[in-house]
């Protein structure tokens, strides 16, 4: 077991004593024991580490200091306290199991192996050593995934004062989650997406502590939150079993299709009849974001809104649109005290967020994180930071790629209109649905036309939903989290955002893990929740904890070892090494399957990809080209975007090329889905427990897909420009694959597979097309870490 902690702040001794006093450990029992020496002080601290017991003295007989003595026996002996004795007991307090996790007579070895930030000093300890060691112990992670102080809090250590308390720069669980206030308001936006001449109102649901102090807010913008239309979603899925066809060439420039900016409607504002002292509507809480639950116990309020075009709000649902983003921006403005909201949709009674300190963070994964990123690009006042996980920064890159209709991994046939159908939760209220059904149907028809599945080209519709051109307007600090095996929201989404932020003046932090489309706040080997606690305590409460310098710029989970996280300063090499593909002049493959295979691969595209990745597979002999480099003599790291430079021709005047970058070599590899460890993490005190998980090494495999990419052969220049393609004439293109950060082990080979139809992601026309590659004039450009 290894635990990687980056949120432990180095603290001067005087400050340690002050904080121990603030949280109740440095009390009269400790000061009374000081005259008796270090062991007596240790005893006074130990008995406070069992909050379930009125008198914890008998517990000292359950803690061993070595093979022969328990703590009580040790204290009676008068022997000096040492690092070995302290650590032997600390490991037990932290929940590690002797003989399973460590040996009682080798505590220091275990501490170093686990990576625990415990205090260490040779020889006999004095009182100050004990206090410093106890402070360090409280910041150390248990085997159950919590700081020890948070573990104690989950067992009732803290009185629920409903007042903020900070330890080692992080907020403590001192708020009563059994008495949270739940209330609803309706925020007036600047948009009128249903075109009724009145500004749209959006429903906001708030959960906050019952406290006398103003608190900051975590806001999650989630179109999913008010309910889903799964049947309508499934009925609207597009068929992907359609042929590719020739596109009429053009000379379109980006300037020709650039989105000119949103024009706000001249819509009527809602009349304010009177000011209400407080909200008048409550709600029954549904499933919430786990990390938000964590912060509710620590003095942060949480707000959720689904935005326009969702249940109990006005307007039409328009995936990723400027209007959707502006509706979420309006919520931030109300939370920061800069916009009006009402107690309901009709009375005109305005209500203020008079419980808020005016500082807001946005959180969430996938669509939720996407809207956090998008709102940040508006530069809205009051938004101090965003924590965006697996977030989209450019919707074209989600449903399209290089002139092709591309499905997010696992969702063939989905598109912007399908996602809108899923979350148009106004369907859930019969009267509202019947009032809006005709307008919604017409609105969806317009979306279908503008998103243009027929060509797959980038146009003004997509440009309006590309947030990258507006990164320079971001004023909030940004935390990004992404899985390098996320083929739903692919890594390019965060890579391009990270690169664009390099010239901004905001603080930015990046976490790259080996998972797919997941949260990582309940991962045992990384103190992610602690790090976000440090970050938000600084950004929203103003705690001077050096969060911006304490947290690494880039935290990367190594792909070749379990429970190993490394820190870096950057991601993305600009220098590349050119590797040849092969020595033959020309090699060909076909993009046609016999009907039985075609139907089989459609039904199970996961099995298709597994078989396709194998270096030797006669079944795909004519449907792909596999190129491999010589085995590496030493470990190498691929850092950024790999480009396949191709000279290729199609037997038709249309075509596509797909490529997979592959690690060939037998090894145990981490699973992309974390394994539950059979334990729950308490998010406060008996509050919203969540499963503790870890990425585990799986059974050995001989290959692993590192990255992937696709391109329409007629969009070689740009996704908005259609180039001509003549049958059986070579063209040259650069196919840039999804970015990665990947360590190839010595003895492994780097491979690239070229093919046509991707049964999971591209259209599947099963057309009889033959592709030929000029391998002499083709190469692989790889950004190896320098």
For each feature predicted by the language model, list its residue ranges:
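N-terminal cap/lid segment of alpha/beta-hydrolase-fold proteins
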Residues: 168-217, 223-226, 231-234, 239-276, ...
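Accessory cap/linker subdomain of secreted extracellular hydrolases
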Residues: 5-161, 172, 229-281, 285-292, ...
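Short beta-strand/loop motif that positions the catalytic acidic residue
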Residues: 474, 480-482, 486
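Gly/Ser-rich "nucleophile elbow"/oxyanion-hole loop immediately N-terminal to the catalytic nucleophile
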Residues: 211, 316-323, 330-361, 366
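Conserved alpha/beta-hydrolase
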Residues: 296-312
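Glycine/threonine-rich phosphate-binding loop and adjacent beta-strand/alpha-helix elements that clamp
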Residues: 4-12, 279-280, 546-786
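Catalytic histidine neighborhood in serine/cysteine hydrolases
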Residues: 502-518
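Conserved alpha/beta-hydrolase "acid-adjacent" motif
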Residues: 487-495
């Amino acid at each position: 077991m290894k635990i990687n902690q980056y949120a432990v702040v180095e603290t001067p001794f005087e400050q340690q004593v002050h904080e121990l006093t603030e949280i109740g450990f440095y009390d009269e029992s400790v000061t009374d024991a000081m005259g008796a020496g270090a062991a007596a002080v240790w005893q006074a601290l130990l008995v406070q580490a069992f909050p379930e017991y009125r008198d914890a003295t008998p517990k000292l007989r359950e803690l061993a200091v070595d093979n022969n003595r328990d703590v009580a026996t040790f204290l009676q002996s008068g022997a000096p306290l040492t690092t070995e004795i302290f650590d032997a007991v600390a490991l037990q307090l932290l929940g590690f199991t002797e003989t399973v996790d460590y040996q009682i007579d080798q505590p220091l070895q275990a501490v170093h192996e686990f990576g625990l930030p415990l205090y260490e000093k040779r020889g006999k300890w004095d009182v100050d050593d004990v206090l410093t060691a106890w402070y360090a112990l409280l910041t150390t992670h248990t085997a159950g995934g919590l700081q020890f102080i948070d573990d104690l809090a989950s067992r009732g250590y803290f009185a629920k004062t409903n007042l903020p308390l900070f330890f080692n720069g992080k907020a403590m669980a001192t708020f009563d989650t059994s008495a949270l206030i739940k209330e609803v308001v309706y925020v007036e936006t600047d948009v009128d997406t249903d075109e009724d001449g009145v500004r749209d109102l959006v429903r906001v649901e708030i959960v906050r502590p019952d406290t006398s102090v103003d608190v900051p807010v975590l806001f999650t913008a989630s179109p999913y939150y008010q309910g889903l239309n799964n049947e309508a979603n499934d009925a609207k899925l597009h068929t992907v079993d359609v042929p590719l066809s020739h596109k009429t060439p053009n000379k379109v420039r980006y300037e020709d299709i650039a989105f000119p900016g949103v024009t706000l409607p001249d819509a009527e504002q809602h009349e304010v009849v009177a000011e209400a002292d407080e909200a008048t509507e409550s709600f029954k809480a549904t499933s919430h974001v786990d990390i938000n639950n964590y912060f509710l116990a620590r003095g942060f309020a949480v707000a959720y809104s689904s935005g326009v075009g969702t249940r109990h709000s006005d307007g039409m649902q328009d995936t990723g649109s400027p209007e959707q983003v502006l509706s979420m921006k309006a919520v931030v403005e109300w939370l920061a005290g800069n916009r009006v909201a009402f107690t309901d949709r009709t009375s005109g009674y305005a209500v203020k967020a008079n419980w808020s300190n005016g500082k807001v963070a946005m959180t969430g994964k996938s669509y939720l994180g996407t809207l956090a990123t998008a709102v940040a690009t508006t530069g809205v006042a009051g938004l101090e930071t965003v924590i965006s996980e697996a977030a989209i920064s450019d919707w074209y890159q989600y449903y399209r790629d290089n002139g092709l209709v591309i499905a997010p991994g696992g969702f063939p046939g989905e598109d912007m209109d399908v996602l809108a159908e899923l979350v148009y939760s106004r369907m859930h209220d019969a009267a509202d649905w019947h009032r809006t059904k005709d307008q919604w149907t017409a609105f969806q028809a317009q979306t279908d036309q503008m998103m243009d599945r027929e060509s797959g080209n980038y146009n003004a519709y997509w440009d309006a939903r590309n947030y990258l051109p507006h990164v320079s307007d971001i004023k909030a600090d940004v935390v990004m989290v992404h899985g390098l095996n996320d083929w739903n929201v692919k890594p390019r989404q965060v890579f391009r955002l990270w690169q664009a932020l390099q010239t901004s003046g905001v603080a930015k932090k990046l976490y790259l893990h080996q998972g797919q489309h997941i949260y990582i706040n309940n991962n045992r080997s990384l103190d992610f929740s602690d790090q976000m606690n440090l970050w938000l305590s600084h950004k929203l409460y103003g705690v001077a904890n050096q969060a911006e310098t304490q947290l690494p710029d880039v935290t990367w989970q190594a792909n070749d070892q379990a429970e190993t996280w490394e820190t870096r300063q950057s991601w993305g090499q600009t220098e590349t090494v050119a590797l040849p593909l092969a020595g033959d002049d020309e090699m060909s493959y076909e993009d046609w399957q016999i009907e039985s295979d075609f139907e089989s691969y459609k039904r199970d595209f996961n099995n298709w990809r597994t078989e396709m990745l194998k270096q030797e597979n006669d079944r795909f002999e004519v449907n792909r080209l596999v190129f491999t480099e010589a085995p590496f003599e030493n470990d190498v790291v691929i850092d950024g975007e790999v480009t396949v430079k191709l000279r290729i021709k199609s037997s038709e005047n249309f075509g596509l090329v797909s490529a997979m970058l592959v690690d060939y070599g037998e090894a145990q590899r981490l699973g992309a889905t974390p394994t539950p460890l059979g334990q729950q993490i308490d998010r406060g005190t008996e509050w919203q427990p969540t499963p503790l998980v870890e990425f585990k090494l799986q059974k050995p495999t001989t290959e692993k897909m590192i990255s992937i990419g696709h391109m329409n052969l007629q969009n070689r220049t740009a996704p908005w420009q259609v180039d001509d393609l003549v049958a059986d004439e070579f063209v040259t293109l650069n196919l840039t694959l999804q970015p990665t950060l990947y360590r190839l082990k010595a003895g492994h080979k780097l491979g690239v597979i070229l093919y046509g139809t991707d049964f999971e992601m591209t259209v599947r026309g099963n057309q009889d097309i033959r592709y030929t590659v000029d391998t002499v004039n083709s190469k692989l450009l790889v950004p190896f870490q320098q």
